[in-house]
From Swiss-Prot:
Residue ranges, compositional bias (Low complexity): 605-615
Name of the protein this chain belongs to: Chaperone protein DnaK
Taxonomy, superkingdom: Bacteria
Gene: dnaK
UniProt keyword NAD, yes or no: no
High-level lineage: Bacteria, Pseudomonadati, Pseudomonadota, Gammaproteobacteria, Pseudomonadales
Length: 637
């Protein structure tokens, strides 16, 4: 059996690695580099260039040079993130017949997996050149927050490249594997902060040592599949374009050739500013007008770059907070922070991470190579060459089906360790129902319509029976690649239907985050509504009690007192109709203050032991409250 190679298929760069004689080795490509740019170019003569050679000719062939294609993999053309990308890249992103986002090169439409396959072929060839034998099997990494369709599309890319993809694993998990192989003994919890070229991921991973075996369990994962180094480059490009426009009045955005040169220069400047305080972007003959050629020369300081991208760095912190919360772990319990991805070399990123986690991140893991190394280790585990590592990954979102009343019934909760299988028995909603539709959903909301539809299928020929009698067993099975298989079986007849959730369309990161945020916001809204309702009820009670007191007081209340109380009652009645809890409480306090002099006067004139006006009212109200609570307790029993 040949080697199972490990491939990090990155947005900006890719890397291939193998495990040899117990050691992980990152392989150099034909150009002698350990990483290969994930860039593919289609030359006019039909030649396909991959990697450094494609990058070198990008300036002269911008429309047919494809980069950051991973950002399109498994996505619909209409998604906001794709529409945003169309504005940023010089090549053409088009709508496929199935509504997916594809690219067009020399008049030919191509799917993102086809293009990514060219990079995988180069990785495969690099490994074959080193090993001197054919390579047919691989472990490929994906961002932890990639959804079902994005994972499927990555597997398809492997198949197109002639590789049997034995396992798709999450990039942060792979990085932790690379880091954990030579770790000291004992248990520890690590954070993997992975800010790559196009995606951001954070994972909380527990590495336990059980009888000499390293067990890697992902406790929680979070991220943003549309935030990475490319976005940092774009900020710098926009700044350079603006500076040039201020100086010359010319806008470079309409010139693909100039923009391609700017992209290269911005990336180079960004890298330089990680080690130096200032750099020059000098691009002679960037464009020309009637007066002659124009040159771009802009000085950029590190602090200027940091001010341009500060909000992007801050955007990575919220997913870190969510991942810790989902894992149920306090930040103080984290033993190590591992940085992965070239963008983590930026001093501002390192400083922000250190401040949030309260400890310096580790620098001994190469951020560009760790993921591929981990993939090679997992490949060796699958091949049986490594026996003391067990990897337990998680599903990033809740999965379930639509049930009666448009409710989503969850079968597999988010952050469940995979592979996993879960079955539940459902029944029919109507008498003599002969078929049921199984509607598979992904998301965190209770209402089915507010979650993402992954697919539907029908289970037909159910024998006639009263509603609630047939037993339909629905099984959800997530394999080790995070890909979902759903089946439904009529227990009476044994008839079965199933579906593999294919790469028809995926959830965008925005949609995922929106679902979680919506669910949290709804819980908060419900709490606020309850508090508002309570305040309104208290306000109404106070108005009623005060009016009763005024009636009982009769002539004892002076005209001024009556006027002040009536005014306060009117203001409270207006507030109770509104939605501002604080305003209701303020007007209640104002009414209480307005009634205090009259209440004191009436209290002083009462015979000893007599009840205060309004007290009976309060007592009745209090009795009601106790009754209600008591009844509720009985119901719960």
């Amino acid at each position: 059996m040949g080697k199972i190679i490990g491939i990090d298929l990155g947005t900006t760069n890719s890397c291939v690695s193998i495990l040899e004689n117990g050691n992980v080795k990152v392989l150099e490509n034909a150009e002698g580099a350990r990483t290969t740019p994930s860039i593919i170019a289609y030359a006019n003569d039909g030649e396909i260039l991959v990697g450094q050679s494609a990058k070198r000719q990008a300036v002269t062939n911008p429309h047919n040079t494809l980069y950051a294609v991973k950002r399109l993999i498994g996505r619909r053309f209409d998604e906001d993130v794709v529409q945003k990308d169309i504005q940023m890249v010089p090549y053409k992103i088009v709508k496929a017949d199935n509504n997916d986002a594809w690219v067009e090169v020399n008049g030919q439409k191509m799917a993102p997996p086809q293009i990514s396959a060219e990079v995988l072929k180069k990785m495969k060839k690099t490994a074959e050149d080193y090993l001197g034998e054919p390579v047919t099997e691989a472990v490929i990494t994906v961002p932890a927050y990639f959804n079902d369709s994005q994972r499927q599309a990555t597997k398809d890319a492997g198949r197109i490249a002639g590789l049997d993809v034995k396992r798709i694993i999450n990039e942060p998990t792979a990085a932790a594997l690379a880091y954990g192989m030579d770790k000291a003994k004992g248990d520890h919890t690590v954070i993997v902060y992975d800010l790559g070229g196009g995606t951001f991921d954070v994972s909380v991973i527990e590495i336990a040592e059980v009888d000499g075996e390293h067990q890697f369990e992902v406790l929680a994962t979070n991220g943003d599949t549309f935030l990475g180094g490319e976005d940092f480059d774009i900020r710098l490009i926009d700044y350079l374009v603006d500076e040039f426009k201020k100086e010359t009045g010319m806008n470079l955005k309409g010139d693909p050739l100039a923009m391609q040169r700017l992209k290269e220069a911005a990336e180079k400047a960004k890298i330089e500013l990680s080690s130096s305080q200032q750099t020059d972007v000098n691009l002679p003959y960037i464009t020309a007008d009637a007066t002659g050629p124009k040159h771009l020369n802009v000085k950029i300081s590190r602090s200027k770059l940091e001010s341009l991208v500060e909000d992007l760095v801050q955007r990575t912190i919220e997913p870190c907070r969510t991942a810790l919360k989902d894992a149920g772990i306090d930040v103080s319990k984290i033993d190590d922070v591992i940085l992965v991805g070239g963008q983590t070399r930026m001093p501002l990123v390192q400083k922000t991470v250190a401040e949030f986690f309260g400890k310096e991140p580790r620098k001994d893991v190469n951020p560009d190579e760790a993921v591929a190394m981990g993939a090679a280790i997992q490949g060796a585990v699958l091949a049986g060459d490594v026996k003391d590592v067990l990897l337990l990954d998680v599903s990033p979102l809740t999965l379930g089906i639509e049930t009666m009343g448009g409710v989503m019934t969850a079968l597999i909760e988010k952050n469940t360790t995979i592979p996993t299988k879960k079955s539940q028995v459902f029944s029919t909603a109507d008498d003599n129902q002969s078929a049921v539709t199984i509607h598979v959903l992904q998301g965190e909301r209770k209402q089915a319509a507010q979650n993402k539809s992954l697919g539907k299928f029908d289970l037909a020929e159910i024998p006639p029976a009263p509603r609630g009698v047939p037993q339909i067993e629905v099984t959800f099975d997530i394999d080790a690649n995070g890909i979902l298989h759903v089946s439904a079986k009529d227990k009476a007849t044994g008839k079965q239907q199933s579906i593999v959730i294919k790469a028809n369309s995926g959830l965008s990161e925005e949609e995922i985050q929106q679902m979680v945020r919506d669910a949290e916001a709804n819980a908060e809204e419900d709490r606020k509504f309850e508090e508002l309702a309570t305040a309104r009820n208290q306000g109404d009670q106070l108005v009623h009690a005060t009016r009763k007191m005024l009636t009982e007081a009769g002539d004892k209340a002076t005209a001024d007192e009556k006027e002040a109380i009536e005014k306060a009652i009117g203001e409270l009645e207006v507030a109770v109709k509104g939605d501002d809890k604080a305003a209701i409480e303020a007007k209640m306090n104002a009414l209480s203050e307005a009634t205090t002099p009259l209440a004191q006067k009436m209290y002083a004139e009462q015979p000893q032991g007599a009840a205060q006006p309004g007290a009976e009212e309060s007592k009745d109200a209090a009795d009601d409250v106790v009754d209600a609570e008591f009844e509720e307790v009985k119901e719960n029993k």
